[in-house]
Amino acid sequence: MSQAGVERLLKGLQILVLVLRLSAGYFPEERWNPESPFRSPTVLIAVLARNSEGSLPEVLGALDRLHYPKERISLWVATDHNFDNTSQILREWLINVQNQYHHVEWRPQEHPRWFRDEESPKHWSHSRYEYVMKLRQAALTSAREMWADYIFFLDADNLLTNSETLNLLIAENKTVVAPMLESRAAYSNFWCGMTTQGYYRRTPAYMPIRRRERQGCFPVPMVHSTFLIDLRKEASQQLDFYPPHADYTWAFDDIIVFAFSCRQAEVQMFLCNKEIYGYLPVPLRSHSTLLDETDNFLHTKLEAMVKGPQVHPSSFVTIPKKVPDKMSFDEVFLINLKHRQDRRERMKRTLYELQIDFKLVDAVYGKMLNQSNVTEMGIKMLPGYKDPYHGRPLTRGEMGCFLSHYNIWKEISERNLEVSAVLEDDLRFEIFFKRRLQTLLHDLEIAKLDWDLIYLGRKRMQVDEPEEPVPGVRNLVVSDYSYWTLGYLISLRGARKLLNAEPLGKMLPVDEFLPVMYDKHPISDYSSHFSTRDLRAFSVEPLLLYPTHYTGDKGYISDTETSVLWDNVTQPTDWDRAKSRKTHQQEKLRSEALNTPSMGSPFDNTARDEL
């Protein structure tokens, strides 16, 4: 540093010392400490629950974990017309947490259990809409009377997985703002378009926001289910849920009534998708049962665990212990590599939530196999085999995957297991998985179908012609050429057919081997090495299992493609997987190739739905 630079530095230090001395005060009585920060704004959280026994433990657990000073929060909780234990769960939780919060208001109504004009517990009748509007208005009035800064409405089946949600919404400084909630479909808690009659209107703006291709806080005509109102804003005094505005002529629906109130008050609603805030279930049809509702939320919870950590219930409510079973299978096998502990823990928790008992099988880690292991097991690659997309030979990862399944087939044969299920650890379950699978097993028994293997999840590779439906068995087709072994059912006879083919001496990837064995592989040279190809293979339709991730997704990991060659451990195989169709999503099928439609969806195509 030059002499001039040193002098400037010393002068700066002298000025800094002088400033510090002045702030300390010349006399002791002039010294002062910096001002303390503002306290967090006060928030009233309003929860309205009806027949929400299946979702409340996790939803309340998410409230427990919110990073916000509890002493600055008041709780306003109402429940009514319940057939289940909603009231008991809420009462227990409130008793246990009430001392943590500034104020608690509890409004239960035990009787009657139904509205006079409703057809089922899921039916939104005129009386039910009106009652919900009155409850929301009562919560809003309570917040105003206690001079709360904000009111935060949270539906009893909306799962907040982001503990900073409340802080993030407050920081947006909007009069009405909602966090975008994820679901299994395109459905979410906002609209991008509204007709002149107040109904939902599909717009090109919706999907880019829903997919988070555009991120930010967007002005929208409708938010619902979970949203924050800033009561400090002057315009918020004109917002009401009930009675509807004097000029209101639209549908008698609580979310539309409030959207109209915002419009009349010239208050813009905003939807934020800057982060993953939480999840909500897709609405069911009005004739759905409470069991459907419970399973619907269970699926929401499982989807949340695919993308994030485990979802835990509140520690302040009593949770009945689940009793897993094998669903009439002789065994349910779960394949997992020991070092993939995140997948192992997620699948263990998921299967527990589904109440499915299973046997954990440590997968064979192909990279740990040395040449002597390979030689000792008599493993040789199928002559002429090349990966269809990269032209490479078999990888150690694919070898390990094959051996993992092969070892299960051996165990099935040795233990004489008549019917088994095999699951990998990188899958997600479709809604109503267990019930749909139980229905399939029942139909198989009634139809006396002669089967060896049934795909529960796969990638259909033959996309030109429809597959043959199976008479007498709903949701089942004869399987054509397919990829993936995410999950399948296998009979004792099927396992022995695969073993009798002696595949270790002519190995190819397991999801290429299976189509060879049911004689649907398009490359006849591969099939020619196996003289007996009579495996009776089928597939559920629609599928019950899908991968958790596809190529290009955040968090995608492949232990089969990201490996080394089977006979050359110095040659890595992590080629450009963007060119590999194998790990991409199912290609769109031509209309003439679609399989015969089976049972209808349990979801409504309603005005709120974005399916």
From Swiss-Prot:
Biased composition range(s): Basic and acidic residues: 576-591
Please give the residues the UniProt entry marks as glycosylated: 85, 173, 370, 373, 568
Q: According to the UniProt record, where is the region Disordered?
A: 576-611
Q: Does the keyword Glycosyltransferase apply?
A: yes
Where mainly found?
endoplasmic reticulum
Q: Which PROSITE patterns match?
A: ER_TARGET (PS00014)
Name the GO terms of the biological process aspect: positive regulation of collagen fibril organization
**Is the Glycoprotein keyword given for this protein?**
yes
Q: Which InterPro entries match?
A: Collagen_mod_GT25 (IPR050757), Glyco_trans_25 (IPR002654), Nucleotide-diphossugar_trans (IPR029044)
Q: Which Pfam families match?
A: Anp1, Glyco_transf_25
What Enzyme Commission number(s) appear in the record?
2.4.1.50
Annotated TM spans: none
This entry carries the following GO cellular component terms, namely:
endoplasmic reticulum lumen
Instruction: Report the residue ranges where the short sequence motif Prevents secretion from ER is annotated in this entry.
Output: 608-611
Name the UniProt key words of this record, in alphabetical order.
Endoplasmic reticulum, Glycoprotein, Glycosyltransferase, Signal, Transferase
Tell me the superkingdom of the source. Eukaryota
Single GO molecular-function term? Answer: procollagen galactosyltransferase activity
Per the entry, what this protein does is: Beta-galactosyltransferase that transfers beta-galactose to hydroxylysine residues of type I collagen. By acting on collagen glycosylation, facilitates the formation of collagen triple helix.
Its family? Belongs to the glycosyltransferase 25 family.
Protein name (database record): Procollagen galactosyltransferase 1-B
Q: Which organism is it from?
A: Xenopus laevis (African clawed frog)
